[in-house]
């Protein structure tokens, strides 16, 4: 698979030969959906809680006598049928939202995403991205020259100047190949990969 190599002005020059195993795989929408859903589910925290009838504040006194009032029977005010009563199946912070995806499926899903990005022209390769100083303005000007506004940068090692300069830019993220997640790959409009990172991605996924 041939990937576009961009210069500092964002213009296409030479091409980089990449592995077809990683960047030339068929598009598998069902697998990508499964991998993304699992990633989102595993990121969830148990941050919601409701009370059952044991936990709500109530009295155990019987509201009215069993017979003779014409009303429906009632034992105590904590009944789930009553306003202010406990829930029958309450949400709990201990709820487990995790989804398991086999390693082979996860790798295949990432390969399918990388391949589709390459086919759509959203994936490009650069020699390297170097900043002389950790200035957001310098990086913003570089992206403007290259015509980028929403970009995920995958680099072999995260340069400190590059990381500090990118923190205040919206829709910009910088990761190493091992931390590239399926949701970010789909979310950003463009994915820039350094030449050294391409080799690392092939090593991780092939």
Swiss-Prot record:
One of the primary rRNA binding proteins, this protein initially binds near the 5'-end of the 23S rRNA. It is important during the early stages of 50S assembly. It makes multiple contacts with different domains of the 23S rRNA in the assembled 50S subunit and ribosome. Forms part of the polypeptide exit tunnel. NCBIfam families: rplD_bact (TIGR03953). The keyword RNA-binding applies. Keywords: Ribonucleoprotein, Ribosomal protein, RNA-binding, rRNA-binding. This is Large ribosomal subunit protein uL4. PANTHER family: 50S RIBOSOMAL PROTEIN L4, LARGE RIBOSOMAL SUBUNIT PROTEIN UL4M. Residues 58-70 have a biased composition (Basic residues). HAMAP family: Ribosomal_uL4_B. GO terms for cellular component: ribonucleoprotein complex; ribosome. Residues 46-78 are annotated as: Disordered. Part of the 50S ribosomal subunit. Pfam families: Ribosomal_L4 (PF00573). GO terms for molecular function: rRNA binding; structural constituent of ribosome. Gene3D superfamilies: 3.40.1370.10. Belongs to the universal ribosomal protein uL4 family. One of its GO terms (biological process) is translation. The keyword Ribosomal protein applies.
